[in-house]
């Protein structure tokens, strides 16, 4: 289980990764990827479904695209401009989020608080598949979740995991990505005590020690907003942001066209 440092100082409080939080299946969609008919994205009790009736529904999040019976064999895609698009089987557009940004790599994430949020473009990437000074040998580490949002903190062997890949904020102050062919590390072993990792609201990963001295930074500072670090199933650890679109709960009476009743 990820161990998380709970700070009393408001300046660094933020959202903490729950100890029991474990991703239930895939919880993100990347630019160029497709969520097929009856496909799911899940995070805890929240389930985004591209339904057979062409309606995109976020169960327990009180949101839907209101496109029931407006197409057949519909699919959801995320474009290189951060826009979510539902297309009919004949290729025609049924619905779009209408939230375009600059061209880049984006991620649509089922947030643990029950929202679907589009982050991007990507501002930083850790690649464990290429050799270099930051390479290391793989070893087995216990499993936990794969997302870190702005304001969240990992410390003392707290970790993100995706399949056999593990991103660990080790107790020796070294940030290590186990997996891939070569792995990756921040090369900060022994550089501080009681170190913690935090993703700030400018898309920058920062390691600080117990004196709040900066030990390491991703140097990926961008404009202010909400960001997410995703440890992807392919082993890449990528920061996306800021958030450019998100769902908002709809009134119960507007939640129509559901295939599965009683889940909201």
Swiss-Prot record:
The keyword Amino-acid biosynthesis does not apply. SMART domains: B_lectin. Forms heterotetramer of 2 chains 1 and 2 chains 2 arranged as a dimer of chain 1 and chain 2 heterodimers. The keyword Disulfide bond applies. May be used as a potent insecticidal agent against hemipteran insects. The gene is CEA. InterPro entries: Bulb-type_lectin_dom, Bulb-type_lectin_dom_sf. Residues 1-23 form the signal peptide. GO terms for molecular function: D-mannose binding; metal ion binding. Disulfide bonds join 54-74, 173-195. This is Mannose-specific lectin CEA. Mannose-specific lectin. Shows agglutinating activity towards erythrocytes from rabbit. Has insecticidal activity against cotton aphids and other hemipteran insects. A motif (Carbohydrate-binding motif 2) lies at residues 170-178. It comes from the Eukaryota. Beta-D-mannose binds at residues 51-55, 59, 63-64, 170-174, 178, 182-185. It is found in: Secreted. Residues 26-131, 145-252 form the Bulb-type lectin domain. One of its GO terms (biological process) is response to other organism. Keywords: Disulfide bond, Hemagglutinin, Lectin, Magnesium, Mannose-binding, Metal-binding, Repeat, Secreted, Signal.
């Amino acid at each position: 289980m990820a161990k998380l440092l709970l700070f009393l100082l408001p300046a660094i409080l933020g959202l903490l990764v729950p100890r029991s939080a474990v991703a239930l299946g895939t919880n993100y969609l990347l630019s160029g990827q497709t969520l097929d008919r009856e496909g799911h994205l899940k995070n805890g009790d929240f389930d985004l479904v591209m339904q057979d009736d062409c309606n995109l529904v976020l169960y327990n999040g009180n949101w839907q695209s209101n496109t029931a019976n407006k197409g057949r064999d519909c699919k959801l895609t995320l474009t290189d401009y951060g826009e979510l698009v539902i297309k009919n089987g004949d290729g025609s557009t049924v619905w779009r989020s209408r939230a375009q940004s600059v061209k880049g790599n984006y991620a649509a994430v089922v947030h643990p608080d029950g929202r679907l949020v589009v982050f991007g473009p990507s501002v930083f990437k850790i690649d464990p598949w290429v050799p270099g000074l930051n390479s290391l040998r793989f070893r087995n580490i216990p499993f936990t979740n794969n997302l870190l949002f702005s304001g969240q903190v990992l410390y003392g062997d707290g970790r993100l995991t995706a399949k056999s890949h593990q991103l660990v904020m080790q107790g020796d102050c070294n940030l290590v990505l186990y997996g891939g062919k070569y792995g990756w590390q921040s090369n900060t072993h022994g550089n501080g005590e009681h170190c913690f990792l935090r993703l700030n609201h400018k898309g920058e990963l920062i390691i600080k020690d117990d004196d709040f001295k900066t030990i390491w930074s991703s140097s990926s500072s961008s404009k202010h907003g909400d960001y997410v670090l995703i440890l992807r199933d392919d082993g890449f650890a990528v920061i996306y942001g800021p958030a450019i679109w998100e769902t908002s709960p709809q009134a119960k009476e507007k939640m129509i066209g559901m295939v599965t009743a009683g889940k909201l």
